[in-house]
Swiss-Prot record:
Known role: Component of the large ribosomal subunit. The ribosome is a large ribonucleoprotein complex responsible for the synthesis of proteins in the cell.
Domain of life: Eukaryota
The organism's taxonomic lineage, starting at the top: Eukaryota, Metazoa, Chordata, Craniata, Vertebrata
Main location: cytoplasm
Summary of subunit composition and partner proteins: Component of the large ribosomal subunit.
Entry's Gene Ontology cellular component terms: cytoplasm; large ribosomal subunit
Protein name (database record): Large ribosomal subunit protein uL1
Single biological process term from Gene Ontology: translation
Amino acid sequence: MSKVSRDTLYEAVREVQAGSISKRRKFLETVELQISLKNYDPQKDKRFSGTVRLKTTPRPKFSVCVLGDQQHCDEAKAAEIPHMDIEALKKLNKNKKMVKKLAKKYDAFLASESLIKQIPRILGPGLNKAGKFPSLLTHNENLNTKVDEVKSTIKFQMKKVLCLAVAVGHVRMSEDELVYNIHLAVNFLVSLLKKNWQNVRALYIKSSMGKPQRLY
């Protein structure tokens, strides 16, 4: 991350954390990386999207639901992870409101191999529209590990506007954890951009209720 010095990064993180201590909120504030782009035409240039796994889960309350076959539902039940089987999904009967409610209830979904292909047919396009189409869950993976992976993965997606924001942590993480996550996120984002740093107008970090701190 050549353009943002370690000192700048640590200083910004300290400011964000100090701000959240001086005004304690009733909820755990998320720390967000805000990106403003330049020399980019969302109409003409390729809209990028990509995911990167951070070292520390940015949102501890991030909820994942398993849409599973029998084995995955049993594993999820044992691990106290929310889950639904194919019968429960069929009961939603493609009802748009119910599917929307399901998409709103959880932050992400995992689906067994046997179910994932059937989801558009059983649920319609609701999860996809909400940007929450399930990730694949196979039987060679440990369910808890996979859930942790989903919880620590963030997604950059270029839409029609020249600014983006992603969660990179929360205010009670250590300085080092936050710095590491921000470092990973910024480097990954810059690698997605056509002209790398030449496409970056500004970078800020801020907590949910705090003031933005400029990094670049």
